[in-house]
């Protein structure tokens, strides 16, 4: 490897927890420190698979639940070559949702186990840091544009949060919980501090494989 690799940093949380805003602020902060950084979002709605997912989320089409889950996973896998190349080039990737969202949302539906939901994503690039933005779903429901898409109901989001809490028991993943009920700047400071530490640590380590 010709240069120190970038870190893979993921922000997770229930809908409207502020992930997208914080991803943007973190990328700017990393760039201002003199390092390369880019944002990635899942689902990536620009691909053909992503467009199928987008139509489903916007309630323009209906898809069978197993099919939807596998489409979300395929959407992540199709971006793996790009992710690996960028990390090897020393670009830090800040990711707005990843496999953990896929597992939490599908396993919140009746009849889906965590294990079944995790299997399609086994072997994805393993994040160096996963920050969960903790926010009460009732508070999230009062934030802008809530309820416009499928899954944006408080009852479902509470179940999703429970599934995230189960996923966070996995000590092989570097989870950090952030209180997202505070101001944007307070949340950003915590995220920035945690990310700066992990970027330095990740430089000398190979990219791992998720859930292996």
Swiss-Prot record:
One of its GO terms (molecular function) is dTMP kinase activity. CDD domains: TMPK. One of its GO terms (cellular component) is nucleus. It catalyses: dTMP + ATP = dTDP + ADP. Its cofactor is Mg(2+). Its EC number is 2.7.4.9. One of its GO terms (biological process) is central nervous system neuron development. Disruption phenotype: The number of knockout embryos is obtained at the expected rate. Knockout embryos show microcephaly, neuronal cell death and early lethality. At 2 days post fertilization (dpf), forebrains in knockout animals exhibit higher amounts of apoptotic cells than control embryos. The head size is significantly smaller compared to sibling embryos of the same batch. From 3 dpf onwards, mutant embryos show markedly smaller eyes and prominent pericardiac edema. At 3 dpf, mutant embryos show twitching movements, reminiscent of epileptic seizures. Belongs to the thymidylate kinase family. This is Thymidylate kinase. The lineage of its organism: Eukaryota, Metazoa, Chordata, Craniata, Vertebrata.
């Amino acid at each position: 490897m010709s240069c120190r690799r970038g870190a893979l940093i993921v922000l997770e949380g229930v809908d409207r927890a502020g992930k997208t805003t914080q991803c943007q602020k973190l990328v700017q902060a990393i760039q201002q420190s003199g390092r390369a950084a880019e944002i990635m979002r899942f689902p990536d709605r620009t691909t053909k698979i992503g467009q199928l997912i987008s139509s489903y989320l916007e309630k323009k089409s209906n898809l069978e639940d197993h099919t939807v889950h596998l489409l979300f996973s395929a959407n992540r896998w199709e971006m793996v070559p790009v992710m690996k190349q960028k990390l090897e080039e020393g670009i830090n990737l800040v990711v707005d949702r990843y496999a953990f969202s896929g597992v939490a949302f599908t396993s919140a539906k009746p009849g889906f186990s965590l294990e079944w939901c995790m299997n399609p994503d086994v072997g994805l690039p393993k994040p160096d840091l996963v920050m969960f933005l903790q926010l009460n779903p009732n508070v999230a429901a009062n934030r802008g544009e809530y309820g416009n898409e499928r899954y944006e109901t408080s009852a479902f989001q509470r179940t999703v949060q429970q599934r995230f809490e189960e996923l966070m028991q996995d000590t092989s993943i570097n989870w950090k919980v952030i209180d997202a009920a505070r101001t944007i700047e307070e949340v950003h400071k915590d995220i920035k501090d945690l990310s700066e530490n992990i970027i330095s640590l990740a430089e000398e380590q190979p990219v791992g494989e998720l859930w292996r």
